[in-house]
Amino acid sequence: MASTDKHGDTEYRTSSSTPAPAGVDYFKFDVILRFVLFAASLVAVVVIVTGNQTEVILVPQPVPWPAKFRYTPAFVYFVAALSVTGLYSIITTLASLFASNKPALKTKLLPYFILWDALILGIIASATGTAGGVAYLGLKGNSHVVGWNKICHVYDKFCRHVGASIAVALFGSIVTVLLIWLSAYSIHSRVPK
């Protein structure tokens, strides 16, 4: 005894063949933010590297004394970390562009983007913190330790370059937080409710 009710069969077929929600597609914003991260990394590196300054210091006799980023390990780490960030942002921008027309690949890339973006955020934050600490010592000095005097009143150009570079790196870390948030939200929007 077969049922002649076709209405029940069509309801079952339509509900089972409904595709999973596609989620909101933010890959255009992802590509833009990754390009902005590259630009911020590049600008921060160029600004700190070009901030060299030489001043004549009056010790027993006048001596030219240069200030360069490579004389401070914290600034060298800062340049290296932001260079890695720039390279990473180029690679992930290209990956985002490549995956922009492939929905299955987009979904697979999102967890990896979150993981690697979080790692890069840690690198940017640690580099910015170490460079910021040394820059603060250059600006204010430390009267409790002999030899840690202020230098920014003498090396004003160098200190301005360091400060601007740190500010741009902080902006880059905010962009990285936005990238993590965007990827997490994209994954969340793809989960069926």
Curated annotation (Swiss-Prot):
Where, in residue ranges, is this chain on the Extracellular side?
A: 52-73, 130-161
* Alphabetical UniProt keywords: Cell membrane, Glycoprotein, Membrane, Transmembrane, Transmembrane helix
Please give the superkingdom of this protein's source: Eukaryota
Please indicate if the UniProt record lists Iron-sulfur as a keyword. no
Naming one, the record's GO cellular component terms include: plasma membrane
Where does the sequence pass through the membrane? 31-51, 74-94, 109-129, 162-182
Official protein name in the record: CASP-like protein 1D1
User: Organism source for this protein?
Assistant: Glycine max (Soybean)
